[in-house]
A protein has these predicted regions:
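Metal-dependent amide/peptide-bond hydrolase catalytic core
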Residues: 1-125
C-alpha cells in the first residue's frame, strides 16, 4: 500500500491500479553484517566491481525463509561480471542458459570467501 501511495504521487491519481498477486515485501539492509562482508570480499577479488543494492521484481525463495526466521537478512548476491560484447544477461533463464568457465570459477571463489569470512566474523562476536 505504501508503494501504491508513492506511485500515485509520481504518476497522479488518474490511473487505476489492480494488484493481481500480493505477498509481503522482503527487504534486506544495505549495511552491516553479511552485506559488509560481501562488499569487502568483492573489493579484494575485483576492486572495480561495484556492489549495488537492487530491487527484484521476480519471485525469490527468501519468501519461504523470512517468515520462519523473522529478522533474517537474505541477499540475492550474484558475483557476476558482464563480459564486453556478450549478451549474457539475455541468457539468464533462457533456453541456452550458460556462463563462461572463468566466470563460474570467479563466482565460486567469491562465494567461498564470503561464507568463510562471514562465518569467521560471526564466531568472534
Amino acid at each position: 500500500e505504501s508503494f501504491l501511495a508513492e506511485l500515485r504521487q509520481v504518476v497522479g491519481h488518474d490511473l487505476d491500479f489492480e494488484i493481481d498477486q500480493y505477498s509481503p515485501p522482503l527487504e534486506a539492509r544495505a549495511e552491516g553484517g553479511l552485506y559488509d562482508v560481501i562488499v569487502a570480499v568483492m573489493q579484494r577479488h575485483d576492486p572495480a566491481a561495484p556492489v549495488v543494492p537492487s530491487l527484484s521484481t521476480g519471485g525469490t525463495d527468501a519468501k519461504h525463509i523470512v517468515p520462519r526466521r523473522p529478522g533474517t537478512q537474505v541477499y540475492g548476491f550474484m558475483p557476476y561480471r558482464q563480459q564486453p560484447g556478450l549478451e549474457e544477461m539475455q541468457l539468464i533463464h533462457g533456453h541456452d542458459e550458460r556462463t563462461s568457465v572463468d566466470e563460474l570459477l570467479f563466482a565460486t571463489r567469491v562465494l567461498y570467501d564470503v561464507v568463510i569470512n562471514y562465518t569467521n566474523s560471526t564466531e568472534t562476536q
